[in-house]
UniProtKB/Swiss-Prot annotation:
One of its GO terms (cellular component) is cytoplasm. The gene is prfA. Transmembrane segments: none annotated. This is Peptide chain release factor 1. Peptide chain release factor 1 directs the termination of translation in response to the peptide chain termination codons UAG and UAA. InterPro entries: PCRF, Pep_chain_release_fac_I, Pep_chain_release_fac_I_sf, Prokaryotic/Mito_RF, RF-1. Methylated by PrmC. Methylation increases the termination efficiency of RF1. Belongs to the prokaryotic/mitochondrial release factor family. Keywords: Cytoplasm, Methylation, Protein biosynthesis. It comes from the Bacteria. It is found in: Cytoplasm. GO terms for molecular function: translation release factor activity, codon specific. The keyword Membrane does not apply.
Amino acid sequence: MLNKLESAKDHYIRLEEQLSDPDIIGDQQRFRKLNKEYSDLKEIVQAYDRYISNRRQIEEVLGMLAKESDPEMKALAEEEYNELLADQPELEQQLKLLLLPKDEADSRNVIMEIRAGTGGDEAALFATDLLRMYQRFAERRGWKCELLEFNEANTPGACKEASMAISGHDVYGIMKFESGVHRVQRVPETETQGRIHTSAASVAVLPEAEEVDIEIRKDDLRVDTFRSGGKGGQNVNKVETAVRITHAPSGIVVACQEERSQLQNRERAMKMLRAKLYDRELADKNKERADLRKSMVSSGDRSAKIRTYNFPQSRVTDHRIGYTSHALPQILDGNLDDLIEALKLYEQTARLQEQQQ
């Protein structure tokens, strides 16, 4: 493991030098490729540096203990030695987790779909809350977020179903844990008796596919155009700019009406179709995965109940790992980092155990 880490650090230093080379800076395609490699190695190298620093400090303290005769100084050195030694297993475990091979789709952008489920108007309002939560999370991480489709429910402004494209660094690797059924428990504004209602919304996170990943034959597509309309039926477009594409072999139907031109809506609809087909392909490849890992990443499975948002108790519980937080308002405002880090750690640990079996 240490040889592998030393090689990674050497490569990281070489990349750092290359990224300051004017010739490489001038070649944007090559610069982006090298910069991604550099970013991918950064966390590993930083963890390795902490591990090496810890080992050196242990050696220094052991040397001090061998020479020290003063009882008080020796006791302090022993205390420091025990603290440093206690840190070693955690640092080693962190390195093992970071060295695990990444899923091939982790670095990709995503298409996210949110649909109101059981619960009528309350489910649509909750789907709107989730849409805003993910938009805020993307904003906090500096990602680009584009709304592809928004179908309004009976309640003005509430989301029946929506889809959006999120692009940035390692988006799928971070967002993939959000696929599944999200449940909400709260008292609706229209509830006069103060009773708590339960409703749900489903989320699907699909890795974005490039044209080279998925071959789509034009003959397999049926493209329909229709007039797009604003929320609540307002600002109905007189020109058929909205696009619906049906992929005959799979039966998948996608639509986009958020852009002003038919060409832009068609491009976005094709992006959604590629993502759905690529997700199916990945699901077929991953059938051999261990049950634990499949339960962590639903790959767009809308039937898996993953999380409950309880408003009366200001509680969020992720049922896959037993994670509970009482910071519900902050989470709904896009502060998902702690929750997602816990999910990532759980999945990485499961993969490590899988590898060691």
